[in-house]
Amino acid sequence: VKPDNSPKDEGYSGGSHEHAIFSLRSTLLFAVIAVAVALAAIHTLQRNWPVGPVILLLGGLPIFGLLVQRRSLRSAAPDLIFGAIDTGLLVIPALWGGLTFGVAGAIAGGVVGDALTDGIAGFFEGAIARWLRKRGIDESRDPLTTSLGKMTGCLVGAGAVLVIASLFGVTLRQSL
């Protein structure tokens, strides 16, 4: 297996002007993608569109960012898996809490679910990172790859759970 030769973003640790510019570009790319995802989610809710499929599709935006920056998806695998497991499982108690106890239940379900799923997903993230390293694949820990990898995983995991919930008849309609 060839080592990953994708660009690295070491942030400001090297102190060089080149690293600072590269880090600024990565930060701007992340910010643009994050704002686009947030605006698309708001747009979806305003129009009462099915949330699950839209969130699932929004997972493509951060993947696009990784590809534009020539980041290896294999290097982002631990973050993708972490995000998918973490937020995919988190949606379950948040959804249940919201349907059962309203907004407060959704918040409590989300907070408790997040605490539990961070630990569960962390086991998988660490195991996958170790597996990749043993095979000579650099599972990059630069800020852009990690942030966009986790964002992708979170959107795909949550979107998939919401789509499955809707197939079981769970409706996610606003009651304003």
Show the residue positions of the predicted features.
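Multi-pass alpha-helical transmembrane bundle typical of ion/small-solute transporters
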Residues: K2-L176
